[in-house]
Amino acid sequence: MGNIFEKLFKSLLGKKKMRILILSLDTAGKTTILYKLKLGETVPAVPTVGFCVETVEYKNNTFAVWDVGSHFKIRPLWQHFFQNTKGARSPGSTHQGSLASGVLPIKCSHVEFGMWKGGRSHPFLPHSSRCAGSGGQLDSILPHQSPAWGPWGCKDLSSGFPSFLTSSILWKSAVVK
């Protein structure tokens, strides 16, 4: 009987735990965004070799954020990072065409974009950095009506502006069940 009340109490007041991937091409700002979320400040970063994992707590949510390296030898392994993932974030510069020409085909070739193990759809939040107003360019790339995608959103951001990062975290926690 005590277990029932404990589960009920945790479900009502407990923290929501989510695993989030940050995937993109080289030097797109993945590590900068991760540490801006974790520490609240920009730190000098070097290219990620392999992956980096940090736990970020925001309001009533706990995010295990995975910054996955994007060297061409690592990209085929991206599919393995999607297990038990509640969503993905993809920073990139659409000015350089990285989202359209690099990241989207890579992800689509390894998993149904927006689909993870078990056929469940999850939120995907592409971020567009270094080019103001470029989020509109993603509207022509990403299918709005595909039931396989689940909810998705796009935010133009710079890792130097924490309000954009926190609004994306709030969006993620709102759409993830």
UniProtKB/Swiss-Prot annotation:
Positions where lipid (N-myristoyl glycine) attaches: 2
GO molecular function, one term: GTP binding
Residue sites binding GTP per the record: 24-31, 67-71, 125-128
Highest rank taxon of the organism: Eukaryota
Keyword Secreted: no
InterPro entries xref list: ARL17_C, P-loop_NTPase, Small_GTPase_ARF, Small_GTPase_ARF/SAR
Alphabetically ordered keywords of this record: ER-Golgi transport, Golgi apparatus, GTP-binding, Lipoprotein, Myristate, Nucleotide-binding, Protein transport, Transport
BP GO terms, sorted: intracellular protein transport; vesicle-mediated transport
UniProt GO cellular component terms: cytoplasm; Golgi apparatus; plasma membrane
Subcellular compartments: Golgi apparatus
Sequence similarity: Belongs to the small GTPase superfamily. Arf family.
PANTHER family registered for this protein in UniProt: ADP RIBOSYLATION FACTOR-RELATED
UniProt function note: GTP-binding protein that functions as an allosteric activator of the cholera toxin catalytic subunit, an ADP-ribosyltransferase. Involved in protein trafficking; may modulate vesicle budding and uncoating within the Golgi apparatus.
Full protein name: ADP-ribosylation factor-like protein 17
Source organism: Homo sapiens
